[in-house]
Amino acid sequence: MDIIETAKLEGHLESQTNNSTNTYTSPTEAVEEEDKNGKGKPKTLSNGLRKGAKKYPDYIQISMPNDSRNKLPLEWWKTGIAFVYALFNLILTTVMITVVHERVPPKELSPPLPDKFFDYVDRVKWAFSVSEINGMVLVGLWLTQWLFLRYKSIVGRRFFFIMGTLYLYRCITMYVTTLPVPGMHFQCAPKLNGDSQAKIQRILRLLSGGGLSITGSHILCGDFLFSGHTVVLTLTYLFIKEYSPRHFWWYHLVCWLLSAAGIICILVAHEHYTVDVIIAYYITTRLFWWYHSMANEKNLKVSSQTNFLSRAWWFPIFYFFEKNVQGSIPCCFSWPLSWPPGCFKSSCKKYSRVQKIGEDNEKST
């Protein structure tokens, strides 16, 4: 009797197993069955899993978070604000030069201050023209390079903010301390003695000529502390080197020679005191390096007791411009316009291969 009952129980279990097998076929059995028919392929396994999952959804779907946020948003409207900021300080500088010019003492009454560089190097008349030409060449190179940058909006707002801040500092220094002319060769324009209309004309003349001697617009005196020419020569070189490929060493060397020669020619021409050039170089390089260190380091973007850089007066402005920029800007170029054919477009060159693979994965998804 025990044998008969055991046989019945095994038959009952076998029938239940067959019924469940008829309703659901495991992927492994499907593969084995198709292997017998000579059609076993890796593709059948994935199909079996897919069909089984759809028919019997006894699983938990875990949705992975997709980081769809752009780590380098362009935000051109912020670039426009930075441009207005730089333009305002540039106009303010011309106004301040016009005001300070009225306070410059005559060179007959207040001779030039002693300067060690002038004691050892005689004045060369054409040297200042070389300095201004070098500055225009560097500005042209930087403008061309900036137009081909992929993230030109982020780089542009950095340039405009730093340039505007430097000229704001220059307005303050030249206003609080008026130095006598650095050489007896200076031919300053006559004082206007309160003629507002003539002062406005001088401001417009300075703006139209860029404040350059070779354009005939540099006729006012008093803007000696600190040198605006040194600011332009230094800042353009720093941006050219920072946002160009590292293996363009020859390009960096040429730009460095143009910048260094231009700064030396300012002193050789006796157009600025040596202290003017030193202060301009120091303030320009410090502000550039501080800003980019804070922009590239996430921890320095947060105001805290240990972050002493956040105590700068311009930190709120910096945070407004850089709060959505995650990480450093890759050296990536693109055609500035969308109309040229594809043969003229070059692929972006990045230093990080991992970043390139990440962007390819984002495009595929």
Curated annotation (Swiss-Prot):
**Catalysis: reaction(s):** an N-acylsphing-4-enine + a 1,2-diacyl-sn-glycero-3-phosphocholine = a sphingomyelin + a 1,2-diacyl-sn-glycerol; an N-acylsphinganine + a 1,2-diacyl-sn-glycero-3-phosphocholine = an N-acylsphinganine-1-phosphocholine + a 1,2-diacyl-sn-glycerol; an N-acyl-(4R)-4-hydroxysphinganine + a 1,2-diacyl-sn-glycero-3-phosphocholine = an N-acyl-(4R)-4-hydroxysphinganine-phosphocholine + a 1,2-diacyl-sn-glycerol; an N-acylsphing-4-enine + a 1,2-diacyl-sn-glycero-3-phosphoethanolamine = an N-acylsphing-4-enine 1-phosphoethanolamine + a 1,2-diacyl-sn-glycerol
Spans through the membrane: 80-100, 128-148, 159-179, 219-239, 248-268, 273-290
GO process terms (BP): ceramide biosynthetic process; ceramide phosphoethanolamine biosynthetic process; regulation of bone mineralization; sphingomyelin biosynthetic process
Pathway entry: Sphingolipid metabolism
**Sequence ranges of Low complexity compositional bias:** 15-28
Per the record, which residues fall in region Disordered? 9-50
Q: Which UniProt keywords apply?
A: Cell membrane, Golgi apparatus, Kinase, Lipid metabolism, Lipoprotein, Membrane, Palmitate, Sphingolipid metabolism, Transferase, Transmembrane, Transmembrane helix
What role does it play?
Answer: Sphingomyelin synthase that primarily contributes to sphingomyelin synthesis and homeostasis at the plasma membrane. Catalyzes the reversible transfer of phosphocholine moiety in sphingomyelin biosynthesis: in the forward reaction transfers phosphocholine head group of phosphatidylcholine (PC) on to ceramide (CER) to form ceramide phosphocholine (sphingomyelin, SM) and diacylglycerol (DAG) as by-product, and in the reverse reaction transfers phosphocholine from SM to DAG to form PC and CER. The direction of the reaction appears to depend on the levels of CER and DAG in the plasma membrane.
Family that this chain belongs to: Belongs to the sphingomyelin synthase family.
Which named protein is this? Phosphatidylcholine:ceramide cholinephosphotransferase 2
Q: Which organism is it from?
A: Rattus norvegicus (Rat)
